[in-house]
Amino acid sequence: MIWQDGKLLSPGAVLPGDRVYHGMRIWDPGHSKVAALCHIHGEPPVRNARILYLGAAAGSTVSFLSDYAEVVYAVEFSPRPVRSLIRLARARKNIIPLFEDARYPERYLPFVEPVDLLIQDIAQRDQAEIALRNLIFLKQGGHLILFLKLLSMGTDKKREDRIVEVVNLLEHGGITDPAVLDLDRYHTGHTAVWGIYSLSKNFEK
């Protein structure tokens, strides 16, 4: 990724509303959890990668990922942001918009090739389970990044207990040593869980 003067930059075509620095788009950590992750904890492997992004919304973060990736499969189920996502995909040929519910990955299975990176950004009670269902697309050794909004999972348990619960679920599903990464500096109440998919570990279960 491209960094200049502490700014994360993106080399793609400038879109309306983008801030620009030295002719490149500024990837704002306050507007994108992926950018926040890069600023606080390091870069995920996005360059020339095949990425599946769950919860793409109107495609702001997806557009930045597409500047670096080979292809981004962008799943969104809300009609209004999907319209913006489709317009974006017309201008960026390596974005494939999928108007689907990420809880049912079998519905878009024919359209998604194996990916190097799976990003889950859906704030629902079953957000960890949604990530696990979509592991069918992730290559051996591929990376999973799950953005957790813990309040969306209910208030009946402590934050720490929720995180332990999610980590245990991911490990049981084949994610190796998931790291819990705080994003509060830019996104209050959000946590990232980042791990690597190991089929052999899954089989051991």
Swiss-Prot record:
Which BP terms does GO give this entry?
Answer: box C/D sno(s)RNA 3'-end processing; tRNA processing
Pfam families, A to Z: Fibrillarin
Which keywords has UniProt assigned to this entry? Methyltransferase, RNA-binding, rRNA processing, Transferase, tRNA processing
Query: Any keyword Zinc?
Result: no
User: Can you state the subunit structure given in the record?
Assistant: Interacts with nop5. Component of box C/D small ribonucleoprotein (sRNP) particles that contain rpl7ae, FlpA and nop5, plus a guide RNA.
Q: Which source organism does the UniProt entry give?
A: Methanospirillum hungatei JF-1 (strain ATCC 27890 / DSM 864 / NBRC 100397 / JF-1)
- CDD domains referenced in this protein's UniProt entry, alphabetically: AdoMet_MTases
Which residues take part in binding S-adenosyl-L-methionine? Answer: 60-61, 76-77, 101-102, 121-124
**InterPro entries in UniProt:** Fibrillarin (IPR000692), SAM-dependent_MTases_sf (IPR029063)
Note the superkingdom of the native organism.
Answer: Archaea
- Spell out the protein name for this chain: Fibrillarin-like rRNA/tRNA 2'-O-methyltransferase
| Annotated EC | 2.1.1.-
Q: Which NCBIfam families match?
A: PRK04266.1-2 (NF003276)
Q: Which GO terms describe its molecular function?
A: histone H2AQ104 methyltransferase activity; RNA binding; rRNA methyltransferase activity
